[in-house]
A protein has these predicted regions:
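Short, strongly hydrophobic alpha-helical membrane anchors
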Residues: 1-9
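Cytosolic juxtamembrane amphipathic/interface segments immediately preceding
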Residues: 3, 58-76
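N-terminal signal-anchor transmembrane alpha helix
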Residues: 10-31, 92
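Pore domain of cation channels
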Residues: 18-22, 77-162, 243
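Membrane-interface amphipathic/juxtamembrane segments adjacent to transmembrane helices
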Residues: 30-59, 159-175
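Hydrophobic alpha-helical segments of integral membrane proteins
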Residues: 40-55, 107-115, 119, 130, ...
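Non-transmembrane accessory domains of multi-pass membrane transporters/channels
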Residues: 162-238, 243
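Soluble C-terminal extramembrane regulatory/interaction domains of multi-pass membrane proteins
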Residues: 171, 201, 223-226, 230-392
């Protein structure tokens, strides 16, 4: 069957649209230093995510799911470049169709070598030569940009995880805001409170949140890069720091590091909101305090009890501090929960629901202190900071 030349030109026009769409996605994703909406990369992310949800849907063990989900980001990157190259292949094949003698299969056979192998094509005519040269150039540029993109991703990932690892050393893991305050005051049993280090901590995490907001909205696959340890997550780490700032501002308004804590909170909930919107979630810019939060007053009391175990100084009564804590947490809870659920972050205390509803929150791990007795045997003893809180 001979396809009319007019129909071939219509197909060529469709090919131009495919090439332009794919090129726009490549430029927006790999070159433009800001979050650029691309339906192609968004659909690839949704498709890969759906596959991983299907694979992990019946995996009950969180550690096993974490091992599977560790490959999620890499799969997104591979499928992303595959989608671009396939669209270029189909697009240039349709563009070539009016210039070749034969059917559409001949056009595909001519366009393929131009994209995959430099100089492997034999053009017939000036128009065909120009099309194949452009196809070859675009194929090389796309692969080169994707390769150059990887060091940028891993540099941002390493900066992010450096902050998470330092927080784990201070607060344990999975991270929890009250635990951060308790351990900071307890100071590893030194007898000298290190609460005076909180201003520096909040200043560091203000910068950390700003860096993550910029990098993770510009390079969205970073959101799905998981921490090296299964019980660590950048989402729960930031949530922990924000909860600790909200707690200390609510409980100790006169002695808290007000400016660093407020700036950290502002940078933190802006980070959560920006990343959540980049992922496609509809989160309010200014949440209504009357919405309430998922943390109950009883769980808030459990947190205060945890602080009292280590004699953390508290100025206000719980019933007076509670409204202020709610007012702070409502700013970031919805966005944080949306991201945590989407990436299946470790179910830390106060970090919201996950897809697997039967999964219980995991309290921070607190190893016992081992001391050698006179008989040479180790006798584990619990520190005040090593008691387990209520898993609210």
């Amino acid at each position: 069957m001979v396809v009319p030349l007019a129909a071939r030109y219509v197909a060529a026009a469709v090919g131009v649209l495919l090439v332009a769409t794919s090129a726009g996605s490549v430029i927006g994703t790999l070159i433009v230093p800001r979050s650029v909406a691309s339906w192609l990369t968004k659909r690839v992310d949704e498709l890969v995510n759906a596959v991983y949800v299907l694979i992990t849907d019946h995996v009950r063990s969180f550690r096993r799911r974490d091992r599977i989900m560790a490959t999620h980001a890499a799969a997104v990157l591979l499928c992303q470049i595959a989608a671009w190259l396939v669209m270029f292949f189909v697009g240039f094949s349709l563009i070539l169709w009016p210039t070749v003698h034969g059917g559409i299969s001949t056009a595909f056979g001519t366009a393929g070598p131009a994209l995959w192998e430099i100089g492997a094509y034999r053009a017939k005519g000036g128009a065909q030569q120009a099309i194949l040269d452009v196809a070859s150039l675009i194929g090389i540029i796309t692969v080169t940009l994707q390769i150059a993109y990887l060091p940028t991703l891993y540099s941002s990932f390493n900066r992010r995880e450096n902050g998470v690892a330092l927080l784990n050393a201070r607060a344990g893991y999975p991270s929890w805001g009250p635990e951060l305050l308790a351990r900071t005051h307890y100071a590893l049993g030194s007898g000298v409170s290190s609460v005076n280090t909180l201003p520096d901590l909040y200043a560091d995490w203000e910068k950390w949140a700003a860096d993550v907001a910029e990098s993770h909205t510009t390079y969205l696959p970073l959101v799905r890069f998981r921490s090296p340890k299964p019980l660590s997550s950048w989402v729960t780490s930031l949530l922990c720091v924000l909860d600790s700032a909200a707690l200390i501002l609510s409980l100790n308004p006169s002695t808290a590091p007000v400016v660093p804590a407020r700036l950290c909170l502002r940078a933190g909930f802006t980070c959560f909101q920006d990343v959540a919107r980049a992922m496609g979630f509809d989160v309010p810019a200014e949440p209504d305090p009357d919405m309430g939060i998922s943390v109950t007053y009883e769980q808030f009391l459990d947190a205060i009890a945890r602080l009292e175990e280590v004699d953390f100084p508290i100025e206000r009564k719980p019933e007076d501090a509670w409204p202020d804590f709610v007012g702070w947490r409502v700013n970031y809870e919805q966005a944080a929960f949306a991201i945590a659920r989407a990436v299946d972050a470790v179910p830390a205390l106060w970090s919201g629901p996950r897809r697997h509803k039967e999964l219980q929150p995991i309290p921070p791990f607190r190893p016992p202190l081992g001391r050698v007795s006179n008989g040479g045997k180790k006798s584990p003893r619990k520190l005040a900071a090593d008691r387990k809180p209520s898993a609210g």
